[in-house]
């Protein structure tokens, strides 16, 4: 009687009396997206094989054959010659089947002491660790581009906004450094997340560990992990590290989206603070004059995509009992797409930021509107002994008068200012007008974290030093 092993293609098929439905086969197969893990799968398998040989679980000849076969498979994959088969379900069984075809029984011994449960968990962690490092580098590129732009605009004055209303003058360099701070925290979160990603699940087997005398710490060292997952059930079943990475990525994209919103506003003709290089914009098929900031607009949209992946992964895990469940196959596509989206976005934003053209005159003209130095006038009165709330009320009255007349505070003569503010007239002198200039306003915020040009230059220096670490 022909054995089930010869009749069925699946590695687990001996237990079953009928072949898998073609519909189910397509529904459950993951090979056409998890093949992305092929090279880390090979790396994990080689580390596992070396440990098995060191522990005398397989022979030195078996190890040599496995290494030789894996080298050939790796080459086939890199050259695009490897034939992926739907019938073999996933990346792991495709590679194992090819290995066995190349080297015979030695290939069948590779899976000793291992399950696909701990194998895939190891693959994902290996792959994600490398992607975190890549994204960290891209965050640094964007930070560097923004730092350069901030340094060039340490003295460029623009309006600062609250509620999208003109609030106080700031320097454009100071404004850009706010985003540098955000992306710096993003980089810190990625590094912190990496510490929890960088634990080895291999050795947990299906869920309970293995009866073989394995050396998990040796495998961890070979693969560059900081240590091993301490509990076999947890090692194969949880994907909190993927959720944590996706949450950190959602914050990256949130910061990109905020920056994008401002770029779109700043580039609009009604604002005209900046121009984005043509290579990052598109036109209209009907309106010849259009130059559209499609890149930042699309980044805003892609932020929702990454947020959706975070919700998908959280929902994926919320109802799973221990240990591994097939639900976890659904972790990869959201994770892969999150990595692709974040990496592509950061790469293009670093290049786009370096090509921004700043329009200082437009920024200055906007800062002169909306009574942006009103707080400075209140501070002037406070420094002459008036309680702040009284100063606030007096200046608000002056703003109302100027608004009705269609002029700015700085347009009032000294006599007019005293006349309109009789209760504080004795506190107002010729020096008041120095407080009402844009330059005087920003220069007065001369403390760490302030918008004064000297502080911006100091912050640029500190940001560069942090980036170099």
Swiss-Prot record:
GO terms for biological process: arginine biosynthetic process via ornithine; L-arginine biosynthetic process. Disulfide bonds: none annotated. This is Argininosuccinate lyase. Belongs to the lyase 1 family. Argininosuccinate lyase subfamily. Pfam families: ASL_C2, Lyase_1. InterPro entries: Arg_succ_lyase_C, Argininosuccinate_lyase, Fumarase/histidase_N, Fumarate_lyase_CS, Fumarate_lyase_fam, Fumarate_lyase_N, L-Aspartase-like. Its main location: cytoplasm. It comes from Burkholderia orbicola (strain MC0-3). It is found in: Cytoplasm.
